[in-house]
A protein has these predicted regions:
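Terminal, non-globular segments
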Residues: 1-162
Length: 162
């Protein structure tokens, strides 16, 4: 990875983290899009699985620091998602919009499944409702936002023409 492509990837990562903490709270949706998952997935497909897991762990610890009730749940979930995204990059590393949307959807849904099961705040029918209704809706919103971000941020994500 060249210095220029590394700088563009870092800029994209920081923009997505900034959007997560500025734009997402303003929307206030019940099934919100998750820009941290976008940042994690886009960073993880560019590195080896262990580094993807470390990126996920770091993002998870940062996001969990804001919600001490569920400290560690986000770190575990993002570590698993970062590892799996990096491991599956050969399958999903295509310029196919539907495949990228499915990649974002699956990444967010797996994160939510792990997060809400490990968190232990919900139980019974509330957990089932969260995992089978609200999490897929949030994953769909994340996938739509991810595809739109791929179109908007294409100059930052493509390798430089030499």
């Amino acid at each position: 990875m060249s210095l220029g492509s590394m700088a563009r990837a870092l800029a994209t990562f920081l923009i997505l983290v900034l959007l997560h903490y500025t734009l997402r709270p303003l929307l206030g949706w019940r099934a919100p899009m998750d820009f941290l998952i976008h940042a994690l997935l886009l960073a993880s497909i560019r590195v080896r699985p262990a580094v993807g897991a470390l990126i996920g762990l770091a993002l998870g610890i940062v996001s969990d620091s804001l919600t001490p009730d569920s400290l560690g749940a986000g770190a575990i979930a993002m570590t698993v998602v970062g590892y799996l995204a990096s491991w599956l990059k050969a399958v999903f590393f295509a310029d196919n919009i539907a495949l990228n949307a499915f990649f974002f959807f699956l990444g967010k849904w797996v994160f939510d499944l792990i997060y809400f099961i490990v968190e232990h705040r919900l139980g019974g029918i509330e957990l089932v409702q969260q995992l089978l209704l609200w999490s897929p809706l949030s994953a769909a919103a994340t996938a739509v936002a991810g595809v739109l971000l791929l179109f908007v941020m294409r100059p930052l994500l493509e390798p430089a023409k030499v």
